[in-house]
Protein backbone atom coordinates (compact mmCIF):
# COMPACT_ATOMS: atom_id res chain seq x y z
CA UNK A 1 0.00 0.00 0.00
CA UNK A 2 1.29 3.42 -0.93
CA UNK A 3 1.18 6.51 1.18
CA UNK A 4 1.63 9.94 -0.30
CA UNK A 5 2.84 12.85 1.76
CA UNK A 6 3.20 16.39 0.56
CA UNK A 7 5.65 18.87 1.92
CA UNK A 8 5.90 22.50 1.13
CA UNK A 9 9.42 23.41 0.26
CA UNK A 10 9.96 26.96 -0.91
CA UNK A 11 6.25 27.18 -1.68
CA UNK A 12 6.44 24.18 -4.01
CA UNK A 13 4.90 20.78 -3.46
CA UNK A 14 7.06 17.71 -4.09
CA UNK A 15 5.49 14.25 -3.89
CA UNK A 16 7.54 11.81 -1.83
CA UNK A 17 6.56 8.22 -2.30
CA UNK A 18 6.93 6.02 0.72
CA UNK A 19 6.36 2.31 0.20
CA UNK A 20 6.73 -0.92 2.05
CA UNK A 21 10.30 -2.20 2.41
CA UNK A 22 9.76 -5.08 0.01
CA UNK A 23 8.62 -2.85 -2.84
CA UNK A 24 11.53 -0.48 -2.22
CA UNK A 25 13.96 -3.36 -2.33
CA UNK A 26 12.57 -4.66 -5.63
CA UNK A 27 12.66 -1.17 -7.12
CA UNK A 28 16.30 -0.60 -6.13
CA UNK A 29 17.35 -3.97 -7.52
CA UNK A 30 15.57 -3.15 -10.80
CA UNK A 31 17.42 0.18 -11.06
CA UNK A 32 20.71 -1.58 -10.28
CA UNK A 33 20.25 -4.07 -13.12
CA UNK A 34 19.24 -1.29 -15.55
CA UNK A 35 22.53 0.47 -14.83
CA UNK A 36 24.46 -2.76 -15.32
CA UNK A 37 22.66 -4.08 -18.37
CA UNK A 38 25.88 -4.25 -20.37
CA UNK A 39 28.03 -5.41 -17.48
CA UNK A 40 28.76 -8.65 -15.76
CA UNK A 41 26.87 -9.40 -12.54
CA UNK A 42 27.23 -12.19 -10.05
CA UNK A 43 25.53 -13.13 -6.82
CA UNK A 44 28.21 -12.47 -4.21
CA UNK A 45 26.78 -15.06 -1.85
CA UNK A 46 27.89 -17.71 -4.30
CA UNK A 47 31.46 -16.48 -4.59
CA UNK A 48 33.01 -19.79 -3.61
CA UNK A 49 30.34 -22.07 -5.04
CA UNK A 50 31.21 -24.63 -7.63
CA UNK A 51 31.61 -22.71 -10.87
CA UNK A 52 30.09 -25.42 -13.04
CA UNK A 53 27.01 -25.80 -10.86
CA UNK A 54 26.16 -22.11 -10.66
CA UNK A 55 27.58 -20.88 -13.95
CA UNK A 56 24.30 -20.78 -15.83
CA UNK A 57 22.26 -19.48 -12.92
CA UNK A 58 24.36 -16.58 -11.74
CA UNK A 59 26.30 -15.36 -14.77
CA UNK A 60 25.24 -13.20 -17.68
CA UNK A 61 28.45 -12.68 -19.63
CA UNK A 62 28.72 -11.22 -23.17
CA UNK A 63 30.81 -12.66 -25.99
CA UNK A 64 34.21 -11.06 -26.47
CA UNK A 65 33.46 -10.00 -30.07
CA UNK A 66 30.60 -7.75 -28.89
CA UNK A 67 32.34 -6.58 -25.75
CA UNK A 68 34.61 -3.54 -25.47
CA UNK A 69 36.88 -3.18 -22.44
CA UNK A 70 34.88 -5.69 -20.43
CA UNK A 71 36.19 -7.05 -17.17
CA UNK A 72 35.09 -10.49 -18.34
CA UNK A 73 33.69 -12.04 -21.52
CA UNK A 74 33.29 -15.47 -23.08
CA UNK A 75 35.28 -16.90 -25.97
CA UNK A 76 33.53 -17.24 -29.33
CA UNK A 77 34.81 -20.83 -29.58
CA UNK A 78 36.36 -20.33 -32.99
CA UNK A 79 37.96 -23.59 -34.11
CA UNK A 80 41.71 -23.50 -34.53
CA UNK A 81 43.25 -23.46 -37.96
CA UNK A 82 46.43 -25.02 -36.60
CA UNK A 83 46.61 -27.44 -33.71
CA UNK A 84 50.01 -28.48 -32.42
CA UNK A 85 49.48 -31.44 -30.05
CA UNK A 86 52.06 -32.07 -27.39
CA UNK A 87 52.88 -35.57 -26.20
CA UNK A 88 54.91 -36.06 -23.03
CA UNK A 89 56.85 -39.15 -22.06
CA UNK A 90 55.65 -40.17 -18.58
CA UNK A 91 58.32 -39.82 -15.91
CA UNK A 92 58.95 -41.85 -12.78
CA UNK A 93 57.29 -39.21 -10.64
CA UNK A 94 53.58 -39.59 -10.00
CA UNK A 95 50.81 -37.25 -8.93
CA UNK A 96 48.73 -37.96 -5.84
CA UNK A 97 45.63 -38.81 -7.84
CA UNK A 98 47.55 -41.38 -9.89
CA UNK A 99 48.81 -43.35 -6.89
CA UNK A 100 45.81 -45.68 -6.81
CA UNK A 101 46.53 -46.66 -10.39
CA UNK A 102 50.15 -47.35 -9.49
CA UNK A 103 49.10 -49.54 -6.57
CA UNK A 104 47.31 -51.91 -8.90
CA UNK A 105 50.30 -52.10 -11.24
CA UNK A 106 52.75 -52.76 -8.42
CA UNK A 107 50.87 -55.86 -7.37
CA UNK A 108 52.55 -57.66 -10.26
CA UNK A 109 56.29 -56.86 -10.24
CA UNK A 110 58.41 -57.83 -13.21
CA UNK A 111 61.45 -60.05 -12.93
CA UNK A 112 64.87 -59.93 -14.53
CA UNK A 113 63.99 -62.31 -17.35
CA UNK A 114 61.10 -60.05 -18.33
CA UNK A 115 63.48 -57.13 -18.67
CA UNK A 116 65.69 -59.22 -20.94
CA UNK A 117 62.69 -60.07 -23.10
CA UNK A 118 62.16 -56.40 -23.84
CA UNK A 119 65.65 -56.00 -25.17
CA UNK A 120 65.73 -59.36 -26.99
CA UNK A 121 62.51 -59.08 -28.96
CA UNK A 122 62.30 -60.36 -32.53
CA UNK A 123 62.37 -56.98 -34.15
CA UNK A 124 65.32 -56.04 -31.99
CA UNK A 125 63.61 -52.71 -31.27
CA UNK A 126 63.55 -51.18 -27.82
CA UNK A 127 60.46 -49.14 -27.06
CA UNK A 128 60.71 -46.42 -24.44
CA UNK A 129 57.17 -47.14 -23.32
CA UNK A 130 58.03 -50.77 -22.53
CA UNK A 131 61.10 -49.77 -20.54
CA UNK A 132 59.10 -47.21 -18.62
CA UNK A 133 56.37 -49.70 -17.75
CA UNK A 134 58.93 -52.19 -16.49
CA UNK A 135 60.69 -49.67 -14.29
CA UNK A 136 57.45 -48.26 -12.97
CA UNK A 137 56.20 -51.68 -11.88
CA UNK A 138 59.45 -52.38 -10.07
CA UNK A 139 59.41 -49.02 -8.31
CA UNK A 140 58.53 -49.05 -4.63
CA UNK A 141 55.75 -46.70 -3.63
CA UNK A 142 57.82 -45.14 -0.91
CA UNK A 143 60.08 -43.71 -3.62
CA UNK A 144 57.14 -42.31 -5.57
CA UNK A 145 57.99 -38.76 -6.64
CA UNK A 146 56.06 -36.16 -8.50
CA UNK A 147 57.65 -32.92 -9.58
CA UNK A 148 61.02 -31.35 -8.95
CA UNK A 149 61.84 -30.19 -5.46
CA UNK A 150 61.61 -26.53 -4.64
CA UNK A 151 65.36 -26.02 -4.51
CA UNK A 152 65.93 -27.70 -7.87
CA UNK A 153 62.87 -26.34 -9.63
CA UNK A 154 63.64 -24.77 -12.98
CA UNK A 155 62.49 -21.17 -13.15
CA UNK A 156 61.78 -19.59 -16.48
CA UNK A 157 63.86 -16.46 -17.12
CA UNK A 158 60.71 -14.37 -16.74
CA UNK A 159 61.07 -14.43 -12.95
CA UNK A 160 64.44 -12.72 -12.98
CA UNK A 161 64.00 -10.28 -15.86
CA UNK A 162 65.45 -7.42 -13.87
CA UNK A 163 68.73 -9.28 -13.45
CA UNK A 164 69.62 -9.77 -17.08
CA UNK A 165 72.28 -7.62 -18.67
CA UNK A 166 72.50 -6.68 -22.34
CA UNK A 167 75.93 -5.79 -23.63
CA UNK A 168 75.92 -4.28 -27.12
CA UNK A 169 79.28 -4.69 -28.83
CA UNK A 170 79.43 -2.58 -31.97
CA UNK A 171 83.20 -2.96 -31.91
CA UNK A 172 84.77 -6.19 -30.77
CA UNK A 173 87.65 -5.13 -28.55
CA UNK A 174 88.55 -8.52 -27.17
CA UNK A 175 91.17 -9.95 -29.55
CA UNK A 176 90.47 -13.52 -28.46
CA UNK A 177 86.77 -13.15 -29.13
CA UNK A 178 87.45 -11.32 -32.40
CA UNK A 179 89.56 -14.23 -33.61
CA UNK A 180 86.79 -16.66 -32.65
CA UNK A 181 84.26 -14.49 -34.47
CA UNK A 182 86.31 -14.51 -37.67
CA UNK A 183 86.85 -18.26 -37.48
CA UNK A 184 83.12 -18.88 -37.24
CA UNK A 185 82.62 -17.18 -40.59
CA UNK A 186 84.90 -19.64 -42.33
CA UNK A 187 83.75 -22.86 -43.93
CA UNK A 188 83.29 -25.63 -41.39
CA UNK A 189 85.89 -28.41 -41.46
CA UNK A 190 84.16 -31.44 -43.01
CA UNK A 191 86.51 -33.93 -41.39
CA UNK A 192 85.28 -33.02 -37.90
CA UNK A 193 81.56 -32.91 -38.70
CA UNK A 194 80.79 -36.06 -40.71
CA UNK A 195 78.68 -37.52 -37.93
CA UNK A 196 76.76 -34.29 -37.38
CA UNK A 197 76.13 -33.96 -41.12
CA UNK A 198 74.66 -37.44 -41.26
CA UNK A 199 72.36 -36.57 -38.38
CA UNK A 200 71.35 -33.36 -40.12
CA UNK A 201 70.55 -35.18 -43.36
CA UNK A 202 68.33 -37.57 -41.45
CA UNK A 203 66.62 -34.69 -39.71
CA UNK A 204 66.06 -32.98 -43.04
CA UNK A 205 63.81 -35.86 -44.00
CA UNK A 206 61.79 -35.40 -40.83
CA UNK A 207 58.48 -33.80 -41.70
CA UNK A 208 56.68 -32.68 -38.61
CA UNK A 209 53.87 -30.97 -40.47
CA UNK A 210 51.11 -33.49 -39.88
CA UNK A 211 48.08 -31.83 -41.42
CA UNK A 212 44.72 -33.47 -40.80
CA UNK A 213 41.41 -31.63 -41.17
CA UNK A 214 43.17 -28.24 -41.16
CA UNK A 215 44.93 -29.08 -37.92
CA UNK A 216 48.71 -29.17 -37.69
CA UNK A 217 50.33 -31.17 -34.93
CA UNK A 218 53.71 -30.95 -33.25
CA UNK A 219 54.27 -33.37 -30.34
CA UNK A 220 55.80 -32.14 -27.13
CA UNK A 221 57.64 -34.26 -24.62
CA UNK A 222 57.58 -33.89 -20.87
CA UNK A 223 60.85 -33.56 -18.99
CA UNK A 224 61.08 -34.41 -15.28
CA UNK A 225 57.37 -33.64 -14.68
CA UNK A 226 58.29 -30.01 -15.12
CA UNK A 227 58.64 -28.76 -18.68
CA UNK A 228 56.98 -29.48 -22.02
CA UNK A 229 59.12 -29.43 -25.12
CA UNK A 230 58.25 -29.67 -28.80
CA UNK A 231 60.01 -30.31 -32.07
CA UNK A 232 61.04 -27.34 -34.20
CA UNK A 233 63.47 -27.12 -37.12
CA UNK A 234 66.20 -24.52 -37.49
CA UNK A 235 68.44 -23.60 -40.39
CA UNK A 236 69.13 -24.77 -43.93
CA UNK A 237 69.25 -27.76 -44.08
CA UNK A 238 66.96 -28.03 -41.03
CA UNK A 239 68.23 -29.24 -37.67
CA UNK A 240 65.66 -30.54 -35.19
CA UNK A 241 65.65 -29.03 -31.69
CA UNK A 242 63.34 -29.62 -28.70
CA UNK A 243 62.69 -26.29 -26.93
CA UNK A 244 60.35 -25.38 -24.09
CA UNK A 245 57.29 -23.31 -25.08
CA UNK A 246 57.18 -20.68 -22.35
CA UNK A 247 54.40 -18.12 -21.81
CA UNK A 248 56.50 -16.53 -19.06
CA UNK A 249 59.23 -15.19 -21.37
CA UNK A 250 59.63 -13.79 -24.88
CA UNK A 251 63.16 -14.53 -26.06
CA UNK A 252 64.29 -17.56 -28.05
CA UNK A 253 67.29 -19.42 -26.67
CA UNK A 254 68.89 -22.38 -28.44
CA UNK A 255 71.76 -24.47 -27.03
CA UNK A 256 74.52 -24.37 -29.64
CA UNK A 257 77.76 -26.21 -30.31
CA UNK A 258 79.52 -23.08 -29.09
CA UNK A 259 78.69 -24.26 -25.57
CA UNK A 260 81.28 -26.73 -24.23
CA UNK A 261 79.93 -27.00 -20.68
CA UNK A 262 78.97 -30.41 -19.33
CA UNK A 263 75.28 -29.58 -19.20
CA UNK A 264 75.34 -28.53 -22.86
CA UNK A 265 77.20 -31.61 -24.04
CA UNK A 266 74.52 -33.98 -22.75
CA UNK A 267 71.80 -32.55 -25.05
CA UNK A 268 71.46 -32.23 -28.82
CA UNK A 269 72.95 -28.89 -29.88
CA UNK A 270 72.30 -26.65 -32.85
CA UNK A 271 75.34 -26.17 -35.10
CA UNK A 272 75.18 -22.79 -36.80
CA UNK A 273 78.17 -23.67 -39.02
CA UNK A 274 76.12 -26.30 -40.83
CA UNK A 275 73.41 -23.82 -41.83
CA UNK A 276 73.67 -21.68 -44.94
CA UNK A 277 70.88 -19.38 -43.72
CA UNK A 278 72.53 -18.43 -40.42
CA UNK A 279 74.02 -14.99 -39.86
CA UNK A 280 74.93 -12.87 -36.87
CA UNK A 281 72.60 -10.13 -35.74
CA UNK A 282 73.79 -6.61 -36.58
CA UNK A 283 75.10 -4.89 -34.57
CA UNK A 284 76.91 -7.81 -33.00
CA UNK A 285 75.31 -8.32 -29.58
CA UNK A 286 76.23 -10.43 -26.57
CA UNK A 287 73.66 -11.38 -23.93
CA UNK A 288 73.91 -12.44 -20.29
CA UNK A 289 70.66 -13.81 -18.85
CA UNK A 290 70.49 -14.60 -15.14
CA UNK A 291 68.08 -17.36 -14.08
CA UNK A 292 67.14 -18.37 -10.57
CA UNK A 293 69.80 -21.09 -10.67
CA UNK A 294 72.50 -19.75 -12.94
CA UNK A 295 73.59 -17.55 -15.81
CA UNK A 296 73.34 -18.15 -19.55
CA UNK A 297 75.75 -16.32 -21.82
CA UNK A 298 75.26 -16.10 -25.54
CA UNK A 299 75.19 -14.13 -28.76
CA UNK A 300 72.29 -13.08 -30.98
CA UNK A 301 71.93 -14.70 -34.39
CA UNK A 302 69.41 -14.68 -37.24
CA UNK A 303 68.02 -17.90 -38.70
CA UNK A 304 65.09 -19.62 -40.43
CA UNK A 305 62.69 -21.37 -38.03
CA UNK A 306 60.03 -23.95 -38.85
CA UNK A 307 57.27 -24.75 -36.34
CA UNK A 308 54.76 -27.18 -37.77
CA UNK A 309 53.68 -25.76 -41.14
CA UNK A 310 54.96 -22.28 -40.32
CA UNK A 311 58.27 -21.13 -41.73
CA UNK A 312 59.62 -17.92 -40.23
CA UNK A 313 62.64 -16.41 -41.95
CA UNK A 314 65.12 -13.91 -40.53
CA UNK A 315 64.10 -14.63 -36.95
CA UNK A 316 66.52 -13.36 -34.32
CA UNK A 317 67.39 -15.64 -31.42
CA UNK A 318 70.03 -16.26 -28.78
CA UNK A 319 72.73 -18.91 -29.15
CA UNK A 320 73.77 -20.34 -25.80
CA UNK A 321 77.54 -20.52 -25.62
CA UNK A 322 78.09 -20.84 -21.87
CA UNK A 323 76.21 -21.83 -18.71
CA UNK A 324 77.42 -20.82 -15.27
CA UNK A 325 75.88 -22.01 -12.01
CA UNK A 326 75.10 -19.59 -9.21
CA UNK A 327 76.75 -19.98 -5.82
CA UNK A 328 75.51 -23.08 -3.99
CA UNK A 329 72.96 -23.72 -6.71
CA UNK A 330 72.67 -26.22 -9.51
CA UNK A 331 73.14 -25.24 -13.13
CA UNK A 332 70.16 -24.12 -15.18
CA UNK A 333 70.25 -27.21 -17.41
CA UNK A 334 71.65 -29.65 -14.86
CA UNK A 335 68.34 -31.39 -14.09
CA UNK A 336 66.35 -30.79 -17.25
CA UNK A 337 67.56 -31.88 -20.68
CA UNK A 338 65.87 -29.26 -22.82
CA UNK A 339 67.61 -27.78 -25.82
CA UNK A 340 66.17 -24.28 -25.87
CA UNK A 341 63.32 -21.92 -24.99
CA UNK A 342 60.67 -20.40 -27.26
CA UNK A 343 59.06 -17.46 -25.46
CA UNK A 344 55.38 -16.67 -26.11
CA UNK A 345 54.96 -13.57 -23.93
CA UNK A 346 54.75 -9.94 -25.12
CA UNK A 347 57.31 -7.98 -27.21
CA UNK A 348 58.02 -5.57 -24.34
CA UNK A 349 60.08 -8.33 -22.74
CA UNK A 350 62.16 -8.98 -25.86
CA UNK A 351 65.94 -8.58 -25.67
CA UNK A 352 67.02 -10.77 -28.63
CA UNK A 353 66.34 -8.72 -31.73
CA UNK A 354 63.47 -6.55 -32.90
CA UNK A 355 60.43 -8.84 -33.18
CA UNK A 356 59.23 -12.00 -31.49
CA UNK A 357 58.62 -15.32 -33.19
CA UNK A 358 54.87 -15.11 -32.54
CA UNK A 359 54.58 -11.64 -34.11
CA UNK A 360 56.47 -12.81 -37.19
CA UNK A 361 54.30 -15.91 -37.43
CA UNK A 362 51.03 -13.97 -37.20
CA UNK A 363 52.12 -11.30 -39.68
CA UNK A 364 53.27 -13.91 -42.21
CA UNK A 365 50.28 -16.26 -42.10
CA UNK A 366 47.33 -14.04 -41.09
CA UNK A 367 45.55 -16.62 -38.93
CA UNK A 368 41.84 -16.10 -38.37
CA UNK A 369 42.26 -15.80 -34.61
CA UNK A 370 45.24 -13.99 -33.15
CA UNK A 371 45.62 -16.38 -30.25
CA UNK A 372 47.07 -19.66 -29.07
CA UNK A 373 46.00 -22.10 -26.37
CA UNK A 374 47.57 -24.80 -24.20
CA UNK A 375 46.19 -28.18 -23.17
CA UNK A 376 48.01 -30.26 -20.54
CA UNK A 377 47.00 -33.91 -20.28
CA UNK A 378 45.70 -35.31 -17.02
CA UNK A 379 48.52 -37.81 -16.60
CA UNK A 380 51.07 -35.29 -17.95
CA UNK A 381 51.70 -37.54 -20.94
CA UNK A 382 49.55 -36.09 -23.70
CA UNK A 383 49.41 -32.34 -24.19
CA UNK A 384 48.86 -29.82 -26.99
CA UNK A 385 49.77 -26.34 -28.16
CA UNK A 386 47.18 -24.79 -30.49
CA UNK A 387 47.81 -21.80 -32.76
CA UNK A 388 45.02 -19.68 -34.24
CA UNK A 389 42.09 -20.71 -32.04
CA UNK A 390 40.91 -23.46 -29.72
CA UNK A 391 40.12 -27.16 -29.93
CA UNK A 392 36.70 -28.02 -28.49
CA UNK A 393 37.79 -31.56 -27.71
CA UNK A 394 40.09 -30.28 -24.98
CA UNK A 395 37.61 -28.36 -22.80
CA UNK A 396 33.98 -28.21 -21.74
CA UNK A 397 31.63 -25.31 -21.08
CA UNK A 398 32.52 -21.70 -21.83
CA UNK A 399 35.97 -20.18 -21.95
CA UNK A 400 35.97 -17.16 -19.67
CA UNK A 401 38.24 -14.39 -20.94
CA UNK A 402 39.91 -11.87 -18.60
CA UNK A 403 41.77 -8.73 -19.78
CA UNK A 404 45.54 -8.50 -19.45
CA UNK A 405 46.47 -5.62 -17.15
CA UNK A 406 49.88 -4.92 -18.69
CA UNK A 407 51.24 -6.45 -21.88
CA UNK A 408 54.48 -7.77 -20.49
CA UNK A 409 53.50 -11.00 -18.77
CA UNK A 410 50.22 -12.79 -19.43
CA UNK A 411 48.96 -11.13 -16.27
CA UNK A 412 45.39 -10.53 -15.10
CA UNK A 413 43.77 -9.06 -12.02
CA UNK A 414 42.17 -11.45 -9.55
CA UNK A 415 40.26 -11.06 -6.29
CA UNK A 416 42.44 -13.37 -4.25
CA UNK A 417 43.43 -16.88 -3.27
CA UNK A 418 41.01 -18.59 -0.88
CA UNK A 419 41.88 -21.51 1.38
CA UNK A 420 38.52 -23.18 1.80
CA UNK A 421 36.26 -20.17 2.52
CA UNK A 422 38.78 -17.68 3.93
CA UNK A 423 40.81 -15.28 1.87
CA UNK A 424 44.53 -15.97 2.12
CA UNK A 425 45.80 -12.46 1.43
CA UNK A 426 45.47 -9.54 1.80
CA UNK A 427 43.52 -7.06 3.90
CA UNK A 428 41.63 -7.27 7.17
CA UNK A 429 40.27 -10.72 8.07
CA UNK A 430 42.62 -12.44 5.64
CA UNK A 431 44.73 -15.36 6.82
CA UNK A 432 48.00 -13.48 6.36
CA UNK A 433 46.71 -10.45 8.27
CA UNK A 434 45.47 -12.60 11.17
CA UNK A 435 48.71 -14.58 11.39
CA UNK A 436 50.86 -11.45 11.32
CA UNK A 437 48.76 -9.91 14.07
CA UNK A 438 49.05 -13.08 16.13
CA UNK A 439 52.82 -13.11 15.70
CA UNK A 440 53.01 -9.54 16.95
CA UNK A 441 51.04 -10.41 20.06
CA UNK A 442 53.28 -13.40 20.77
CA UNK A 443 56.33 -11.15 20.60
CA UNK A 444 55.15 -8.95 23.46
CA UNK A 445 57.29 -9.01 26.55
CA UNK A 446 55.53 -9.78 29.81
CA UNK A 447 56.83 -9.37 33.33
CA UNK A 448 57.70 -12.44 35.30
CA UNK A 449 58.81 -12.69 38.88
CA UNK A 450 62.41 -13.19 37.95
CA UNK A 451 62.54 -9.60 36.71
CA UNK A 452 61.40 -8.17 40.03
CA UNK A 453 64.66 -8.59 41.84
CA UNK A 454 65.56 -5.44 43.72
CA UNK A 455 68.89 -4.96 42.06
CA UNK A 456 67.50 -5.39 38.53
CA UNK A 457 64.00 -4.01 38.78
CA UNK A 458 64.82 -0.52 37.48
CA UNK A 459 66.90 -1.87 34.62
CA UNK A 460 64.26 -4.32 33.48
CA UNK A 461 61.49 -1.78 33.98
CA UNK A 462 63.33 0.64 31.72
CA UNK A 463 63.83 -2.09 29.11
CA UNK A 464 60.20 -3.11 29.32
CA UNK A 465 58.96 0.45 28.84
CA UNK A 466 61.25 0.93 25.84
CA UNK A 467 60.03 -2.33 24.33
CA UNK A 468 56.42 -1.35 24.94
CA UNK A 469 56.88 2.04 23.28
CA UNK A 470 58.60 0.38 20.34
CA UNK A 471 55.80 -2.16 20.07
CA UNK A 472 53.16 0.59 20.08
CA UNK A 473 55.00 2.30 17.23
CA UNK A 474 54.99 -0.98 15.33
CA UNK A 475 51.26 -1.30 15.90
CA UNK A 476 50.66 2.18 14.52
CA UNK A 477 52.85 1.34 11.55
CA UNK A 478 50.89 -1.89 11.13
CA UNK A 479 47.58 0.01 11.17
CA UNK A 480 49.00 2.34 8.54
CA UNK A 481 50.00 -0.68 6.48
CA UNK A 482 46.53 -2.15 6.87
CA UNK A 483 45.07 0.73 4.89
CA UNK A 484 47.60 0.13 2.14
CA UNK A 485 46.83 -3.58 2.00
CA UNK A 486 43.18 -2.86 1.35
CA UNK A 487 44.16 -0.88 -1.74
CA UNK A 488 46.72 -3.37 -2.99
CA UNK A 489 45.57 -5.38 -6.00
CA UNK A 490 46.31 -9.03 -6.64
CA UNK A 491 47.50 -10.39 -9.98
CA UNK A 492 47.91 -13.77 -11.63
CA UNK A 493 50.67 -14.59 -14.12
CA UNK A 494 50.17 -17.60 -16.41
CA UNK A 495 53.54 -19.25 -16.96
CA UNK A 496 53.80 -22.51 -18.89
CA UNK A 497 57.55 -22.52 -18.24
CA UNK A 498 57.04 -23.11 -14.51
CA UNK A 499 55.68 -26.30 -13.00
CA UNK A 500 54.46 -25.33 -9.52
CA UNK A 501 52.18 -22.47 -8.56
CA UNK A 502 53.83 -19.68 -6.62
CA UNK A 503 53.19 -17.43 -3.63
CA UNK A 504 55.02 -14.11 -3.03
CA UNK A 505 58.05 -14.19 -0.77
CA UNK A 506 56.44 -12.33 2.15
CA UNK A 507 53.54 -14.80 2.30
CA UNK A 508 55.06 -18.20 1.55
CA UNK A 509 55.78 -18.86 5.25
CA UNK A 510 52.15 -18.24 6.18
CA UNK A 511 50.91 -20.37 3.29
CA UNK A 512 52.88 -23.41 4.44
CA UNK A 513 51.69 -22.84 8.02
CA UNK A 514 48.10 -23.17 6.85
CA UNK A 515 48.78 -25.83 4.19
CA UNK A 516 51.73 -27.76 5.67
CA UNK A 517 53.48 -30.90 4.53
CA UNK A 518 52.28 -34.08 6.21
CA UNK A 519 53.57 -37.61 6.53
CA UNK A 520 51.70 -40.03 4.31
CA UNK A 521 52.18 -43.62 3.23
CA UNK A 522 50.10 -46.27 1.50
CA UNK A 523 48.12 -47.00 4.65
CA UNK A 524 46.90 -43.46 5.36
CA UNK A 525 47.32 -41.48 2.16
CA UNK A 526 43.58 -41.20 1.45
CA UNK A 527 42.92 -39.90 4.94
CA UNK A 528 45.78 -37.40 4.75
CA UNK A 529 44.74 -36.05 1.35
CA UNK A 530 41.13 -35.58 2.49
CA UNK A 531 42.35 -33.51 5.46
CA UNK A 532 43.69 -30.76 3.17
CA UNK A 533 41.53 -27.76 2.16
CA UNK A 534 40.45 -26.74 -1.33
CA UNK A 535 42.35 -23.85 -2.90
CA UNK A 536 40.31 -21.41 -4.96
CA UNK A 537 41.50 -18.61 -7.23
CA UNK A 538 38.67 -16.07 -7.49
CA UNK A 539 38.90 -14.04 -10.70
CA UNK A 540 36.31 -11.29 -11.12
CA UNK A 541 34.20 -13.17 -8.54
CA UNK A 542 34.44 -16.39 -10.55
CA UNK A 543 35.98 -19.31 -8.61
CA UNK A 544 38.50 -21.73 -10.10
CA UNK A 545 39.17 -24.45 -7.55
CA UNK A 546 42.00 -26.94 -7.06
CA UNK A 547 41.22 -29.96 -4.90
CA UNK A 548 43.88 -31.51 -2.62
CA UNK A 549 44.53 -34.38 -5.04
CA UNK A 550 45.23 -31.80 -7.75
CA UNK A 551 47.74 -29.62 -5.92
CA UNK A 552 49.49 -32.16 -3.66
CA UNK A 553 52.65 -34.07 -4.53
CA UNK A 554 54.20 -37.04 -2.76
CA UNK A 555 57.91 -37.39 -2.03
CA UNK A 556 59.61 -39.76 0.40
CA UNK A 557 56.42 -40.55 2.32
CA UNK A 558 55.56 -36.85 2.59
CA UNK A 559 52.55 -35.13 1.03
CA UNK A 560 53.44 -31.57 0.05
CA UNK A 561 51.56 -28.74 -1.68
CA UNK A 562 53.01 -28.04 -5.14
CA UNK A 563 53.74 -24.40 -4.36
CA UNK A 564 56.96 -22.45 -4.22
CA UNK A 565 58.26 -18.95 -3.57
CA UNK A 566 58.71 -16.60 -6.52
CA UNK A 567 59.02 -12.87 -6.02
CA UNK A 568 57.87 -10.85 -9.03
CA UNK A 569 59.08 -7.27 -9.34
CA UNK A 570 56.83 -4.78 -7.55
CA UNK A 571 56.41 -3.02 -10.87
CA UNK A 572 54.04 -5.83 -11.87
CA UNK A 573 52.00 -5.80 -8.69
CA UNK A 574 51.31 -8.31 -5.95
CA UNK A 575 51.55 -11.32 -8.27
CA UNK A 576 51.01 -15.05 -7.97
CA UNK A 577 52.08 -17.50 -10.69
CA UNK A 578 50.05 -20.38 -12.13
CA UNK A 579 52.20 -23.20 -13.50
CA UNK A 580 51.69 -25.92 -16.08
CA UNK A 581 51.33 -28.94 -13.79
CA UNK A 582 49.43 -27.53 -10.83
CA UNK A 583 46.89 -25.33 -12.64
CA UNK A 584 47.07 -25.71 -16.44
CA UNK A 585 46.77 -29.45 -16.04
CA UNK A 586 43.15 -28.97 -14.94
CA UNK A 587 42.22 -25.77 -16.77
CA UNK A 588 42.52 -25.18 -20.51
CA UNK A 589 44.10 -21.76 -21.09
CA UNK A 590 43.80 -19.39 -24.07
CA UNK A 591 46.09 -16.44 -24.85
CA UNK A 592 44.62 -13.76 -27.15
CA UNK A 593 46.60 -10.80 -28.45
CA UNK A 594 44.86 -7.45 -28.53
CA UNK A 595 44.71 -5.06 -31.49
CA UNK A 596 43.16 -1.71 -32.45
CA UNK A 597 42.97 -0.55 -28.83
CA UNK A 598 41.36 -3.84 -27.80
CA UNK A 599 42.81 -5.51 -24.75
CA UNK A 600 44.69 -8.79 -24.76
CA UNK A 601 42.92 -11.58 -22.89
CA UNK A 602 43.67 -14.77 -21.00
CA UNK A 603 40.95 -17.42 -21.18
CA UNK A 604 40.20 -20.25 -18.74
CA UNK A 605 37.97 -23.30 -19.19
CA UNK A 606 37.67 -26.65 -17.49
CA UNK A 607 39.98 -29.12 -19.22
CA UNK A 608 38.63 -32.43 -20.53
CA UNK A 609 40.76 -35.56 -20.37
CA UNK A 610 39.38 -38.45 -22.40
CA UNK A 611 40.79 -41.61 -23.89
CA UNK A 612 39.94 -40.25 -27.34
CA UNK A 613 42.18 -37.23 -26.75
CA UNK A 614 45.00 -39.46 -25.57
CA UNK A 615 44.65 -41.78 -28.55
CA UNK A 616 44.54 -38.85 -30.95
CA UNK A 617 47.66 -37.20 -29.53
CA UNK A 618 49.43 -40.53 -29.12
CA UNK A 619 48.89 -41.38 -32.78
CA UNK A 620 50.38 -38.05 -33.81
CA UNK A 621 53.38 -38.67 -31.60
CA UNK A 622 53.88 -42.10 -33.16
CA UNK A 623 53.75 -40.59 -36.64
CA UNK A 624 56.49 -38.17 -35.69
CA UNK A 625 58.68 -40.96 -34.30
CA UNK A 626 58.21 -43.09 -37.43
CA UNK A 627 59.27 -40.37 -39.85
Swiss-Prot record:
The organism's place on the tree of life at top rank: Eukaryota
Keyword Metal-binding annotated: no
TM annotation in the entry: 14-34
Keyword Membrane: yes
Keywords: Aspartyl protease, Cytoplasmic vesicle, Hydrolase, Membrane, Protease, Signal-anchor, Transmembrane, Transmembrane helix, Zymogen
Activity regulation annotation text: Inhibited by small molecule 49c. Inhibited by small molecule WM382.
PTM remark: Autocleaved into a p55 mature form.
EC number: 3.4.23.-
Protein's name according to its UniProt entry: Plasmepsin IX
Organism: Plasmodium falciparum (isolate 3D7)
Protein's gene: PMIX
Amino acid sequence: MFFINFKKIKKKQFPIYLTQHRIITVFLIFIYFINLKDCFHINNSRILSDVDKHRGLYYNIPKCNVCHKCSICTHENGEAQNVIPMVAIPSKRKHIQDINKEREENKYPLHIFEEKDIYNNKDNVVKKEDIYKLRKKKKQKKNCLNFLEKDTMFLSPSHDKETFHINHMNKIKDEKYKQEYEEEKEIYDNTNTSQEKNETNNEQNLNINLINNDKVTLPLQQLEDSQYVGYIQIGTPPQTIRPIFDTGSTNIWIVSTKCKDETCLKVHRYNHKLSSSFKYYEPHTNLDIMFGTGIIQGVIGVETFKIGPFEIKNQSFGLVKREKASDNKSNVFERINFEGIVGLAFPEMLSTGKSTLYENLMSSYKLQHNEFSIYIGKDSKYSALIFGGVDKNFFEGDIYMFPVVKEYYWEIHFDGLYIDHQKFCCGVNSIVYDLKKKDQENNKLFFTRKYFRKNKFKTHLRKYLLKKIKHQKKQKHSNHKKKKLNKKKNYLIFDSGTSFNSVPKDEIEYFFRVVPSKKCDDSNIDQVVSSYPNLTYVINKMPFTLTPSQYLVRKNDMCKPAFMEIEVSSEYGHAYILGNATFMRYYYTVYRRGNNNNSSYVGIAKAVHTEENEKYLSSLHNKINNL
